[in-house]
């Protein structure tokens, strides 16, 4: 997902990092609206994720998405000429960091200044953690495709690792488990709904009703 935070106001935008392209050239929808089309869009509309494994995989679509969000926000929030901070993973190259920097540079917002900061530091500050102490602070950030695990102390990052496992892998595990145990197929969005609704690191008695396809009968069905 993508979040915009404005000093003094808090989070002013929180949307899925998804874009829908019509006929390979026109932006049809972005953010949560595009995500709702995932697995449902017709053949002439491609729904994709411009960011994969913490880096920009499709710079053109990413720029289109950022431009759209800024256009929607600028009239309400007066973002032109502001100072921008971009949070990026630690384990990416300088070229990949530069791509994030260029996203803001290429908008029409005329930013006063752009800072690229490491995501664990931004996470810790967002949670009001004091990372200036000599005692270590562990921050685990689980994203869609990656998980970043960092230890911070004395105002800096002591150790950080980015592993290629995130929420999407959890969704995949849910899909495979239900398919194996129930002979029932669900989509990625349904798997995410299960994860967000009753997902837990501990065993619970919670349940949820979901729709999908019964592999035995081949018909749409519902299970708990």
Show where each model-derived region lies.
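Nucleotide/phosphate-binding catalytic cleft detector across ATP-hydrolyzing
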Residues: 1-142, 152-224
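Conserved Rossmann-like nucleotide-cofactor binding loop
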Residues: 145
């Amino acid at each position: 997902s993508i979040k915009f935070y404005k000093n003094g106001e808090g989070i002013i935008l929180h949307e899925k990092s998804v874009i829908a392209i019509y006929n390979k050239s026109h932006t049809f929808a972005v953010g949560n609206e595009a995500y709702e089309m995932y697995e449902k869009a017709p053949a002439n509309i491609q729904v994709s994720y411009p960011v994969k494994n913490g880096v920009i995989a499709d710079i053109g679509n990413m720029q289109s998405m950022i431009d759209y969000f800024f256009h929607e926000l600028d009239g309400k929030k007066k973002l032109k000429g502001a100072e921008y901070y971009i949070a990026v993973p630690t384990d990416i190259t300088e070229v990949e960091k530069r791509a994030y920097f260029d996203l803001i540079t290429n908008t029409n917002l005329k930013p006063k200044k752009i800072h690229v900061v490491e995501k664990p530091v931004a996470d810790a500050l967002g949670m009001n953690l004091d990372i200036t102490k000599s005692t270590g602070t562990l921050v685990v950030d689980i994203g869609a495709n990656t998980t970043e695990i960092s230890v911070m102390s004395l105002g800096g990052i002591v150790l950080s690792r980015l592993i290629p496992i995130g929420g999407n892998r959890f969704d995949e595990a849910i899909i495979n488990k239900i398919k194996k145990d129930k002979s029932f197929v669900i989509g990625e969005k349904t798997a995410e709904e299960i994860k967000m609704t009753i997902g837990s690191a501990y065993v619970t008695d919670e349940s949820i009703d979901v729709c999908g396809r019964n592999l035995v009968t081949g018909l749409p069905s519902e299970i708990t």
